[in-house]
Amino acid sequence: MSTVISRDGTAIAFERMGSGSPLILVDGALCSRAFGPMPKLAPLLAQTFRVYMYDRRGRGESADTRPYSKEREVEDLEALIGEAGGSAFVLGLSSGAGLALEAAASGLAIEKLAVYEPPYMVRPADSARHAKANHQSQLERLLAAGRRGDAVKYFMRDMVGVPAIFVFMMRFMPGVWSKLEAAASTLPYDAAIMGDFSLPEQRLAAVRTRTLVIGGGKSEARLRAAVEAAARAVPNAQLRTLAGQTHNVKPEVLTPVVTEFFAA
């Protein structure tokens, strides 16, 4: 494990594997170098690229500095790009895709960008519900009361839409619930990145990086709509649908698609 110092002095933990052109992986909510899709995805991509896998601030072995703002997370990614040599490919998943798109719109030196299912809400009923909810405030209230588990449940049920019975069962999965609770304090960060979850059309229009927007063919309709809308909003973006995949995309299916895009 190594660290890079972000602009505000926060130490960001990362590990590097493989050789070739640099590729930085950006996790979604509750995930880290040790938990989520990246531990399986990174070694596959490292067969072709020099992969940088990092703990977003407040997670894993990375430090945290208050007050939080999404601009600080963009600066974290900027520091990693500097560590990688000054420019890099970037792959973001879920809310990490939202962060990666914000970074590209901010002008970071991203050679090419691939994003998987940024969870924007573009259908009227979905966007109205999320705009009214003020998820960031709800999460901050629960965390201020020390209710980490309830914050995770709120995220899973009210934001992601996981059925209550599955959330209940997750509490009894060895090693899973404890990891989710450990990262719960960063849930407001992902809520801040996504805002009211509406499609930030003007911001996406500022992206000048070659971009591939990817979605799963079996994902929920709201996510498929978000992927299509994001691909339209980013200038000259490519759209790719992975047959049979959901929001929890299989690393062995995603790897060849992003490899082909970055290597072209």
Predicted regions and their residues:
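Active-site loop/oxyanion-hole signature of alpha/beta-hydrolase fold enzymes
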Residues: 43, 52-91
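Conserved alpha/beta-hydrolase "acid-adjacent" motif
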Residues: 220-226
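Conserved HGGG/HGGXW glycine-rich cap/lid loop of the alpha/beta-hydrolase fold
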Residues: 3-63
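Conserved hydrolase catalytic core segment
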Residues: 87-126
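Hydrophobic, aromatic-rich cap/lid helix
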Residues: 165, 175-199
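Short beta-strand/loop motif that positions the catalytic acidic residue
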Residues: 207, 213-215
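Serine-hydrolase catalytic core
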Residues: 198-208, 231
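Catalytic active-site module of serine/aspartate enzymes centered on a nucleophile-bearing elbow/loop
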Residues: 235-264
